[in-house]
Structures are given as structure tokens and as C-alpha cells.
């Protein structure tokens, strides 16, 4: 039987912060385990997450920043989402292959970058829509597609404007944590990766 594993990527959290002001995280760490990780340079979200998932340095996985310089457009494109931008075998691919003889190995990837089209069972990531009239519609991408709708029917629309930019705050992390709990309850993944950008 596969023992479920939840990996929380919490920006800026250090072991010294676990304590009376973080009772739920402290309890979770006590029931399982918590470990500090070093980082790579540049120490930005997309690069560090890609290193954690592949075990490779940026020179190996190819993610050297949060943005990509598109020569044809002479423009930096930030926050790209395609899983195909990352080179190398991912943790969830290696784990799935290692337990291939055991049926039922599953992965949930909640709000990690490069989440679109990832070979996982369940995933959700921010993905605004831009209609022809110039508006920005708060939205997200999910695999399977109806997962987003099911989560939003229970939790409301993902608060994208609280995820990044000048209005960023803990509201987005609360939504992601609640969505992750729902996915854990509904599907019981073998491996769950959740990114919480704010405390």
C-alpha cells in the first residue's frame, strides 16, 4: 500500500516560524515531518519549484527565471504555465514508475507552476482569461476540466488578484489550502504537491 505524501511549498517559511503562531502547520509537521531545503540561484518561484521537482539545477531543467525572453517578440513573458517548459524527469513521474506494479498511484498538483498539461491526475493553477474587449477575467485551469467548477461551486472563484501583484495576501493561500483539502478528501492522491504563496 502506498502511504500518501503531501508536499507543501510555502514561500519564506523557515523552521523557526513553526510554533504558537502556526498551530496547524506545526501539528502537520509533527504528525509527519518537515525539513528545511536549500535553494538555487536565482531563488525565485519557478526556478526553485523546477529544481525541487526534477532534482536538477537550472542548467539541467532550463528554468532560469520566472519569465522567458521571447526573441521573436523582443518581450519578456512572465508566468508561463506549460509543463513542457521544464526539462527532466519530475518527482511524480519517477515515483509513479517506481511503484508501477502497485495500481492506483496518483498525483495532485495544486498551484505549482508549469502545471498546464502536466502528466498528473488532478491539477489546478491560476489562468486568467483575456476576452477581446480587453477585460481580465479571473479564472483558473484544471485537469480534469470539471475540477475547477467543482471547487468553485464550494469555495467561490479563486481570488487571483490576491495571488500576485499589489493586492497579494493570504486570501489566495487560504483558497489553495481549502482546495487542496477538498482534493485530498475527494480523491486521496498518493502524492499531493501544494504551493502556498503567502502566510
What spans do the regions from the language model cover?
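Glycine-/proline-rich flexible loop or hinge segments
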Residues: 6-10, 30-35, 45-48, 67-80
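Short, structured active-site-proximal loop/turn typified by the sulfatase FGly-forming signature C/S-X-P-X-R
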Residues: 16-60, 108
Amino acid at each position: 500500500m502506498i502511504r500518501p505524501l503531501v508536499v507543501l511549498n510555502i514561500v519564506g517559511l523557515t523552521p523557526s516560524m513553526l510554533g504558537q503562531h502556526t498551530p496547524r502547520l506545526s501539528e502537520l509537521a509533527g504528525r509527519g515531518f518537515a525539513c528545511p531545503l536549500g535553494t538555487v540561484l536565482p531563488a525565485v518561484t519557478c526556478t526553485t519549484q523546477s529544481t525541487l521537482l526534477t532534482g536538477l539545477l537550472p542548467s539541467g531543467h532550463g528554468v532560469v527565471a520566472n519569465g522567458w525572453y521571447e526573441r521573436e517578440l523582443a518581450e519578456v513573458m512572465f508566468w508561463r504555465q506549460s509543463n513542457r517548459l521544464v526539462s527532466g524527469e519530475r518527482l511524480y513521474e519517477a515515483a509513479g514508475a517506481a511503484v508501477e506494479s502497485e495500481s492506483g498511484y496518483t498525483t495532485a498538483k495544486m498551484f505549482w507552476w508549469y502545471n498546464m498539461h502536466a502528466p498528473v491526475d488532478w491539477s489546478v493553477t491560476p489562468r486568467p482569461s483575456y476576452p477581446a474587449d480587453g477585460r481580465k477575467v479571473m479564472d483558473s485551469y484544471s485537469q480534469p476540466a470539471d475540477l475547477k467548477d467543482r471547487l468553485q461551486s464550494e469555495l467561490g472563484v479563486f481570488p487571483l488578484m490576491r495571488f500576485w501583484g499589489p493586492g497579494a495576501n493570504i486570501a489566495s493561500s487560504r483558497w489553495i489550502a481549502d482546495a487542496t483539502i477538498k482534493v485530498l478528501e475527494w480523491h486521496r492522491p498518493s502524492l499531493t504537491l501544494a504551493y502556498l504563496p503567502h502566510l
